[in-house]
């Protein structure tokens, strides 16, 4: 079991991982590719101490290189959901299940807006993971809404199991989509159905489907971990980066403004030190109960 699972391999997550590793904890980072960090897109950064004029890509390469050099394990994968398990948490990492005593959420700004019907039909036709739920739609019609070329992998897999796959790209250039998939360039408006999904309403038409796969880089934090207190899009934390759930911390852009690397890195370090204290207290408690 991991001591600390970190969700997001941006500045906040990597900063937390480095300090966690130095404090001898079993730490692992689960993150989308480096290029999805917000800072990767910055042309030039002049306000991070010691790195004047660096590009976002260079900064991320340095941060990631530093983490790897001291032995931090980084798994490039998306965390789909986190379930509380008494004194630990179970992570669904693209259908691989990993248990951790503590969790640090460092997932950046949730770039996704919620589609009408998304909450209502989640688990009843709406899914965030093709690998996890694809087999349930064998022989059926589904639609995939993708916000980047990464979603094309999921759609291609669904084309192998589903009777019909529609694909709605929320970006311009398609990269490697299977030819069996029908591309629909229209804005999704609303997921419809009675008890389960029956279709997707678009700007000028609608699709009759049993499944709606929403494949985006980030999953709203409130969806990632049920019961997590949020304030709008931001995870609610105190000064020690503790959330309302025991053993769960948050750091960086996902806790709200200001959106700055220095703040993300500082919060990552605060969060992990708090996780270390929590783990040490857990260990003492376990020893007393032996
Ligand atoms: C164009 C631009 C220029 C900027 N310039 C500056 C600047 O000059 N100075 C400055 O201080 N700040 C700048 N910023 C802000 C800075 O980028 C952010 O404050 C910083 O990246 C926050 O770090 P973070 O780790 O919290 O989030 P991010 O860097 O966004 O990293 C979060 C990571 O988590 C991943 N993730 C999300 N959900 C999941 C999941 N479920 N499973 C796995 N991974 C997940 C994301 O894909 C992403 O890789 C700029 C931002 C932009 C967009």
How would you label these PLM feature ranges?
Residues 1-3, 76-77, 138-140, 245:
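Phosphate-coordination loops involved in phosphoryl transfer and adenosine-cofactor binding
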Residues 2-58, 66, 140-174:
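Beta1-alpha1 glycine-rich phosphate/pyrophosphate-binding loop at the start
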Residues 8, 106-107, 145, 213-216, ...:
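Short, well-ordered coil/turn residues at beta-beta hairpins
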Residues 13, 81, 110-111, 151, ...:
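Glycine-rich nucleotide phosphate-binding loop and flanking beta-alpha elements
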Residues 39-41, 115-119, 135-137, 173-180, ...:
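Short loop/helix-cap segments at secondary-structure boundaries that form the rim of catalytic
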Residues 67-86, 90-92, 98-100, 160-239, ...:
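A Rossmann-like FAD-binding core segment of flavoenzymes
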Residues 74-138:
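Glycine/small-residue-rich loop that forms an oxyanion/phosphate-binding "nest" at active or ligand-binding sites
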Residues 114, 120-136, 216-263, 267-273, ...:
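FAD-site-proximal beta/loop scaffold in flavoenzymes
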């Amino acid at each position: 079991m991991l001591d600390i699972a970190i969700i997001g391999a941006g500045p906040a997550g990597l900063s937390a991982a480095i300090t966690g590793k130095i404090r001898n904890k079993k730490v692992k980072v689960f993150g989308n590719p480096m290029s999805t960090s917000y800072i990767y897109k910055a042309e030039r950064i002049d306000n991070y101490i010691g790195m004047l004029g660096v590009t976002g890509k260079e900064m991320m390469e340095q941060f990631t290189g530093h983490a790897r050099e001291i032995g931090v394990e980084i798994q490039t994968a998306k965390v789909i959901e986190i379930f509380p398990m008494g004194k630990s948490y179970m992570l669904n990492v693209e259908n691989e299940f990993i248990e951790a005593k503590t969790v640090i959420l460092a997932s950046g700004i949730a770039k996704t807006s919620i589609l009408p019907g998304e909450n209502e039909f989640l688990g009843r036709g709406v899914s965030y993971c093709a690998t996890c739920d694809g087999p349930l739609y064998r022989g059926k019609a589904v639609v995939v809404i993708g916000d980047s070329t990464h979603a094309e992998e999921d759609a291609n897999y669904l084309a192998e199991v589903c009777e019909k796959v529609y694909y709605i790209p929320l970006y311009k250039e398609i990269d490697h989509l299977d030819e069996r998939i029908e591309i629909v360039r229209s804005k999704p408006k609303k997921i419809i159905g009675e008890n389960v999904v029956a279709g997707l309403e678009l700007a000028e038409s609608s699709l009759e489907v049993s499944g709606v796969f929403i494949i985006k880089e980030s999953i709203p934090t409130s969806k990632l971990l049920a019961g997590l207190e949020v304030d709008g899009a931001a995870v609610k934390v105190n000064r020690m980066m503790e959330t309302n759930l025991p053993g769960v911390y948050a750091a960086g852009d996902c806790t709200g403004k200001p959106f700055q690397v220095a703040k993300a890195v500082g919060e990552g370090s605060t969060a992990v030190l708090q996780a270390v204290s929590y783990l040490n207290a857990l260990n003492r408690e376990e020893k007393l109960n032996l």
